[in-house]
Structures are given as C-alpha cells and as structure tokens.
UniProtKB/Swiss-Prot annotation:
InterPro entries: p53-like_TF_DNA-bd_sf, T-box_DNA-bd, T-box_sf, TF_T-box, TF_T-box_CS. Probable transcriptional regulator involved in developmental processes. It comes from Homo sapiens (Human). This is T-box transcription factor TBX10. Residues 22-61 are annotated as: Disordered. GO terms for cellular component: chromatin; nucleus. Its main location: nucleus. Residues 69-252 bind DNA. It comes from the Eukaryota.
Length: 385
C-alpha cells in the first residue's frame, strides 16, 4: 500500500496549548462555566474548523471536506456541566463517543481519519465539592507521550466514509504512561481538546512534498473535557447514567438503596478498582464452602484471561517525552530518526470475553492543525508501507 502520511506534518507539539476558534475573547470566563477561566467552551456552530496559520493552500480533495458532530445536543449538555472522561490503567472508552458525519470528499479518493488530544492549558485542576466547581490546583504535570489514534477502517474511499456515521468508539483513554496497547495517554485532572483530522492518501511517489496541503483538521469546542479517574461532579454521573444505553442496570435501581457489601468482600485488595459484581459474591461463597474448588478456579481464571488479553507483540511503546516529529519515518525506505518501528499496533478489537461465573471470574465490560504526535497507533487493515 502506498504511504499516505507525508513528512512535515509535525510542527505544533501536542503539549502546547492549541489556539481554539472562538467568537469572542477566548480567555474570558463563560457565564455558568464550572471552570474559573480558560478557552471559551461555547460552540461556533454545527461544525468547527481549526487550521493553524501557515498551512498554505489545501488540496481540493480535502479543502471541500466538511464535518458535522453527531449527538451535538448531548455534547453541549455535558459541556454546560463540565464534561469529565474516565481514564484508567487498562483504558476506558469515551462517552459520549466521538462520532461525525463527513461530507465533500472525493468518492474515489482514499482518506485516512485520525484523532489526537491536546491540553487546553498548562494547569492542573481539582474539584471543589462545596461549590461544585473546578479550581486551579497548580501547574500542569509533565506532558504525557503524544499519540494519534487512527480509525480502524483507515484508509478507505471517500464514498465509504460519507456513506455512514464515522464513530471512534474503539478509542480508549488511559493514564498509564507505559501503555503498550496504543491507547491515548492523558494526565488525570487536566483538561483536553479532541482534534479530528482528515488526511488525503496521495498516490504520487513524491507525496512528501505535498504534505501540508493533503490534510485538514477539525475541532469541536463542545467536546473538550477534564480527564478524571473517578467522576467528580455528581451531575455528570447522573447524566452519563441517564444517557448511556449501557447503563440500564444503574437506571433501574436506586444507587442510594444498594445493600452494603458483606464482610468477606472487605478483604479485596485496594489496588483493584473494578466494580464488584454478583459473580464475585458467588465466588466468595464458593471459596467459603469448598476451599479446594476455590483454589482451582483462581488458578485457571488468570491464565485464561491472560491468554485472551495478551497484547500483540508489535504494539508501540511511547517515548518518555513529547518531541515534534515528522511522519517521514513512516515511509518505506525513509530514515527513522526516532527508531519508531514500521509495524502497526492493533489495540482493537479485543475479543468479546465473558468470564465464567462458575469460576468466580470478573465479567469484562462490553465495553493535523499542524500535528506532531510522537507515536502513531494504526488500526487493523492498515499497513505503513
């Protein structure tokens, strides 16, 4: 497959604050905003295009592309409260998921779609429960390794992208700096802005020369959020439960009326943050009745899960710091200045695993602006050469 990412796309490091498009003074506090200050979080319309200065003219195959954010009213509702997104060591999917409708592509041309996340500012935040507001807690933590998430169907014809809603529901957020599954790495209690990029796969052999004109970036200010390890604003929790179709079990019961966990569960190690489920109760009972059976199940379940969840060997490991980097190293035969392997990690899709409740197992959930990521996460069906 012809190389489709050109050199020279990496100029603005993701660790830098991105100049967001605004309709007024962008650094004035918005009335009713849960944040003390920061970029204006109001949307500029059904679509928002952000192209840093100095890009020059664009290829007609991307200049006419327009993007519409799906579930815009829901995003705006979350934004009014101050959207929060959970980050975990294993990686957590976003809700609402980032979904867009694309128009204006060349039906016969190939395009790659990708996303990255940039800090909104250089601050770290904390949530004040007494005032239900976010407060600045200090200077931002050291920047996390910058990564780009490719849509798993990339590259594909424009006709395919425009035929249906494009969803990045496989994208996961993590706070694990050593993540080797290709997830987006973020700092907890920091604010981020997702960016969406459309890249034209230029078939010309010298496509590196046209790198600056072969992509177009889009930004929707209503999708910005604060990364958290647990929801801080109870209204965000309620809205997530009310609007997430996978939270049916929470809606059908009163959270305040849940029974207190039995005493044996208090011995569960504190390092385990997984929600306790009925299968844990069953497993605990089995261990009390038959210790031999319990030891057998605990010896089988981890090995079974390890076999199913073993990440592919070609997954990339992010470097320790951000550095502006070009995509020239992704081309076949081009020198690799950072030593980035040209193999693709495939963090998705993981197999749909159901734990054997008789074994006491835990059920698993169903679950470029001028761009300079330091690690590229390719999806299935992609070849970097």
């Amino acid at each position: 497959m012809a190389a489709f990412l050109s050199a020279g796309l990496g100029i603005l490091a993701p660790s830098e604050t991105y100049p967001l498009p605004t309709t007024s003074s962008g650094w004035e506090p918005r009335l009713g905003s849960p944040f003390p200050s920061g970029p204006c979080t109001s949307s500029t319309g059904a679509q928002a295009v952000a192209e840093p200065t100095g890009q020059g003219p664009k290829n007609p195959r991307v200049s006419r592309v327009t993007v519409q954010l799906e579930m815009k009213p829901l995003w705006e509702e979350f934004n009014q409260l101050g959207t929060e997104m959970i980050v975990t060591k294993a990686g957590r999917r976003m809700f609402p998921p980032f979904q867009v409708k694309i128009l204006g592509m060349d039906s016969l041309a190939d395009y790659a779609l990708l996303m990255d996340f940039i800090p909104l500012d250089d601050k770290r935040y904390r949530y004040a429960f007494h005032s239900s507001a976010w407060l600045v807690a200090g200077k931002a933590d050291p920047a996390t390794p910058g990564r780009v998430h490719f849509h798993p169907d990339s590259p594909a014809k424009g006709a395919q992208w425009m035929r249906q809603i494009v969803s990045f529901d496989k994208l996961k957020l993590t706070n694990n700096l050593l993540d080797d599954n290709g997830h987006i790495i973020l700092n907890s209690m920091h604010r981020y802005q997702p960016r969406f990029h459309v890249v034209f796969v230029d078939p010309r052999k010298d496509s590196e020369r046209y790198a600056q004109e072969n992509f177009k970036s889009f930004i929707f200010t209503e999708t910005q959020f604060t990364a958290v390890t647990a929801y801080q604003n109870h209204r965000i929790t309620q809205l997530k439960i009310a609007s997430n179709p996978f939270a049916k079990g929470f809606r059908e019961s009163d959270l305040d009326s849940w029974p207190v966990a039995p005493r044996p569960l208090l011995s569960v190690p504190a390092r385990s943050h997984s929600s306790l489920s009925p299968c844990v109760l069953k497993g605990a009972t089995d261990r009390e009745k038959d210790p031999n059976k319990a030891s057998a199940s605990t010896s089988k379940t981890p090995a079974w899960l390890h076999h199913q969840l073993l990440p592919p060997p070609e997954v990339l490991l992010a470097p320790a710091t951000y550095r502006p980097v070009t995509y020239q190293s992704l081309y076949s035969g081009a020198p690799s200045h950072l030593g980035i392997p040209r193999t693709r990690p495939a963090p998705y899709p993981l197999p749909n695993i159901r734990a054997d409740r008789d074994q006491g197992g835990l059920p698993l959930p169903a679950g470029l602006g001028l761009l300079s990521p330091t690690v590229v996460c390719l999806g299935p069906g992609q070849d970097s050469q």
